[in-house]
Design a protein with these regions (language model features):
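Conserved acidic residues
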Residues: 42, 109, 131
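Short beta->alpha hinge that forms the Motif I/post-I loop of the SAM-binding pocket
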Residues: 74-78, 115, 138
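Short glycine/proline- and acidic residue-enriched helix-loop micro-motifs
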Residues: 14-18
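N-terminal, positively charged/glycine-rich alpha-helical extensions of SAM-dependent methyltransferases
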Residues: 1-13
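A short acidic, Gly/Pro-enriched loop at the edge of an enzyme's catalytic core
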Residues: 103-110
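Active-site regions of enzymes building and remodeling cell-envelope glycoconjugates
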Residues: 89-96, 110, 128-129, 150-155
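SAM cofactor-binding core of SAM-dependent methyltransferases
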Residues: 19-102
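C-terminal substrate-binding/active-site "lid" region of AdoMet-derived donor-dependent transferases
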Residues: 117-211
Length: 211
């Protein structure tokens, strides 16, 4: 399964859509698909669907990977209209206006945070021991909130070692953005994954500093 190719193809597609200034970076899509694969994710919650870039990539990936139960929140009228047109498998999204509307008995393998949501605190009810959280981009405020909700969480930044491609909406002189990986209830295997990412990020920063 070539998730990198899927990420590139979806990023190219969404770069031509109205509202593209708010889509996830190409490298963030690669990270999300890799995490989905590595942690054998079957149930996802995306907080802030936007115009649908992330969900479209994941559902495209699911054609090879296997069925994924996808929940998402969005309450912006423009985004809600765009989702219907942009996401190939739109009918597979279980759509909610905000996190507080989701049954607290639901538990998610993967929670993707890609926007602001005043009801973010409700993720405390929706995470369990196997949950992985990814916050797209920098979003330091949201990282701090999530770590406050999960006092034992461990967090590592996932960064790229290449700049934005010229076929996207973001400046090609800037690094392709990644995101923040958080394990709210870190197991031993999660801690190992964390340290591997920590080392990878360190090496990429060294490479960046040489350019």
């Amino acid at each position: 399964m070539n998730y990198n190719k899927i990420a590139i193809d979806v990023y190219r597609k969404f770069s031509s859509f109205e509202g593209n200034q708010h889509i996830a970076n190409e490298y963030a899509l690669k990270c999300i698909l890799r995490l989905t694969n590595d942690f054998k994710v079957k149930k996802i919650l995306e907080i802030g669907l936007g115009i649908g870039c992330i969900v479209d990539a994941v559902l495209e990936f699911s054609k090879e990977y296997g069925e994924i139960d996808y929940y998402g929140t969005e309450n912006n009228d423009f985004c809600l209209q765009q989702l219907k047109h942009n996401v190939n498998q739109y009918n597979k999204i279980k759509l909610y206006s905000d996190v507080s509307k989701i049954n607290p008995d639901e538990k998610f393998d993967f929670i993707i945070i890609d926007g602001k949501d005043e009801s973010l605190k409700y993720i405390q009810n929706l995470a369990y021991k196997n949950t992985v959280i990814f916050i797209e981009g920098g979003r330091a405020d949201q990282v701090a909130l999530v770590k406050n909700y999960f006092p034992n969480a461990i967090h590592v930044e996932m960064i790229s070692d290449y700049k934005n491609p010229n076929y996207g909406p973001f400046e090609s002189k800037c690094w392709s953005g990644g995101g923040q990986l958080i394990f709210p209830y870190p197991s031993m295997s999660m801690k190992i994954y964390f340290w591997k990412e920590k080392i990878a990020t360190y090496l990429k920063r060294k490479k960046r500093n040489k350019q």
